[in-house]
């Protein structure tokens, strides 16, 4: 007996995307945005199918993502932001709350939400993950969003 395997494909044609982007550490965040847009366009989507919502920082991402998801205008949401560890416990709290909040929005709304929030020890790691040594996590998050929309459409 052959098990039927169902998975999403990397085809962004006819998918409406919302980018929800934290402005804090924007010089790195903008590289994530560029990576996400590049991925969508390389996989058959277009800039006309993308809307971008900017919020102050990572803590606000779940709130904006939920409002966007509930609008019903988008097939997928890509959250992008940058959290860099400082000398206080603020990093741990912020990273945990942003992560949990974004996951909760996805579960509550059943809209595919891709997590493209960098949580790094230092600025060098953030730069590496925004398009240099370690690829571009914005690009990776967009790939996840494309695949999830196409998977959802088969369920």
Curated annotation (Swiss-Prot):
It is an enzyme of class 2 (transferase). Its EC number is 2.5.1.78. 5-amino-6-(D-ribitylamino)uracil binds at residues 24, 58-60, 82-84, 115. It comes from the Bacteria. GO terms for molecular function: 6,7-dimethyl-8-ribityllumazine synthase activity. Pathway: Cofactor biosynthesis; riboflavin biosynthesis; riboflavin from 2-hydroxy-3-oxobutyl phosphate and 5-amino-6-(D-ribitylamino)uracil: step 1/2. The active site is at residue 90. GO terms for cellular component: cytosol; riboflavin synthase complex. InterPro entries: LS (IPR034964), LS/RS (IPR002180), LS/RS_sf (IPR036467). It catalyses: (2S)-2-hydroxy-3-oxobutyl phosphate + 5-amino-6-(D-ribitylamino)uracil = 6,7-dimethyl-8-(1-D-ribityl)lumazine + phosphate + 2 H2O + H(+). (2S)-2-hydroxy-3-oxobutyl phosphate binds at residues 87-88, 129. Keywords: Riboflavin biosynthesis, Transferase. Catalyzes the formation of 6,7-dimethyl-8-ribityllumazine by condensation of 5-amino-6-(D-ribitylamino)uracil with 3,4-dihydroxy-2-butanone 4-phosphate. This is the penultimate step in the biosynthesis of riboflavin. Belongs to the DMRL synthase family. This is 6,7-dimethyl-8-ribityllumazine synthase. The lineage of its organism: Bacteria, Pseudomonadati, Chlorobiota, Chlorobiia, Chlorobiales. The gene is ribH.
């Amino acid at each position: 007996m052959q098990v039927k395997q169902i998975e999403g494909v990397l085809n962004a044609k006819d998918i409406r995307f919302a980018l929800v982007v934290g402005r804090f550490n924007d010089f790195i965040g903008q590289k994530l945005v560029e990576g996400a847009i590049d991925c969508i366009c390389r996989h058959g989507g277009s800039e006309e199918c993308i809307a971008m919502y900017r919020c102050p920082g990572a803590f606000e991402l779940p709130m904006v993502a939920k409002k966007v998801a509930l609008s019903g205008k988008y097939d997928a949401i890509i959250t992008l932001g940058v959290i860099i560890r400082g000398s206080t416990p603020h990093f741990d709290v912020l990273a945990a709350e942003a992560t949990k909040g974004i996951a909760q929005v996805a579960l509550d709304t059943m809209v595919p939400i891709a997590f493209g929030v960098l949580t790094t020890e230092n600025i060098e790691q953030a730069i590496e993950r925004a398009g240099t040594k370690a690829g571009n996590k914005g690009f990776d998050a967009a790939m996840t969003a494309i695949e999830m929309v196409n998977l959802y459409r088969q369920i």
